[in-house]
Amino acid sequence: MTIRNDGAGPKKHRGERRIQCLAIALALFHSTGARADEPARATGEKLAAEAPRKTVESIAKEVRDSIVTIRFQGRGGSDQGLGTGFVIGADGLIASNYHVIGEARPVSVELADGSRHDVTEIHASDRAADLAIVRIARQGLAPLALGAPETLADGAEVVAVGNPHGLERSVVAGRVSGKREIDGRSMIQLAIPIEPGNSGGPLLDMEGKVHGILTMKSLVTPFLGFAIGIDQLQPLIDKPNPVAIDRWLTIGTLDAGEWTTTGGARWRQRAGRIGVEGTGTGFGGRSLCLATTEPPPLPHDLAVWVKLDDEDGAAGLVFAADGADRHYGFYPTAGK
């Protein structure tokens, strides 16, 4: 058999050849485009990973104008308590701890520029959660950005800003050392010393976002503190329960028709329980709360439950008093 190759074969139309060339060109374009895109994407990811993180110094500078000092007053009108807060609303909203604002006390806020403003309302509060938002008559404040608590991992670097022992806007860096349940509340455990005056300050990540509110220190382990997650503040932001300061000051006031007090100190009533804070001006630092109603006819029983929050305090029951230092009773705490 003779095979002849004279170059003859089936003819291809010119249009068909064009389609084939176009298909090859498209294939080459997509192939080279994919290869070119991969290095670009990798380069972008590398640049994002290598982007410089903020330093503690830069974060402290950025948030300085948003940190405030909160003071509440005692009976004589002088400052009795001091804590920290931070701006969450440009229209004068400040977040802090409930225990920082002092229940039924006049409250004032000092801004970074040194100006002092009386709180006009308790915008939102939750005594059980130990959280509060107050309002001052000041516009144009610089609110801090709030972070997502679930993104704050154990071991993460954090920055705390507050007023420990009155040392305003002090900055300390540390790490998240865990999450703990304390008295039924979820808390962020910190390898950071938290001192009196720090309460209510922000716990910041390395982007300057707030992830928690500094709340308490460990009484057992030094340089260990706890913060309330910022997610627990969100319900107060979403559904505030505003109370004008005039009404706030009357919360817990004793019924003058049933009780009278002597010797100073601060007596309050809540949910049928009477409590007292501070040292009285009477003998031995005593202060009395006396019933003004007539007792029932004898014989009758009287039951009283006494709880001391301070080991230095003492409590007693008074059966008769002359309105001054002279009174009769006994101290179930043995004066201790």
Where do the protein language model's features map onto the residues?
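N-terminal activation segment of mature serine protease catalytic domains
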Residues: 36-84, 93-94, 98, 106, ...
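Extracellular carbohydrate-recognition regions
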Residues: 242-264
